[in-house]
Amino acid sequence: MKFARTIRFDKSDLNIFPVAAEEGELALVGTFSFNNIQNEDLKGKVKQAFSNGFIGCSSFGYSTLVSLVTVNEDDLINLQYSFGQYFIEHYGAPSKIIAEKAASEEIKFMSELCKDHELGSLLSVSREWSEEGIKEKFRNLPKADSCAEQKIWTVVDED
């Protein structure tokens, strides 16, 4: 099954988000993490996380980009359990059953988002406030051809 894993090309995420996700952790869309924030409260690093961040599933930090990878069913079961615990501890979910159901819905949403894209491609998210609430847009950046196959210089004999 395809799923998202955080990826970092440079150190910018470390500087722009309140907490940056670790590279290589599974990720969810994470819009739920902004449910209790009003538009006027979005400033600085929190605004950046709101506008362009996926949430990492181990650190609960944010990542600008995710790469599509293959995961197995056990990975997703473990993710459902750990995110269920996170919903109880940080969002006050009233029970383990309700928390794990919410986690399962978030996992399903990410799986659906990933399923039609090629492994190795990248996804980005863009969020904004609208009259109906939070509006999300996703962009797929197709997998680039291997750099090894590209000619980056030419050797010229000198006389």
Q: Language-model features: where?
A:
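Short, surface-exposed acidic
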Residues: 89-104
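Short acidic alpha-helix initiation/capping motifs at coil-to-helix transition points
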Residues: 75-83
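N-terminal accessory interaction module
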Residues: 1-66
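Intrinsically disordered, low-complexity regulatory regions associated with ubiquitination proteins
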Residues: 76, 88-89
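Amphipathic alpha-helical interaction segments
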Residues: 57, 61, 90, 94, ...
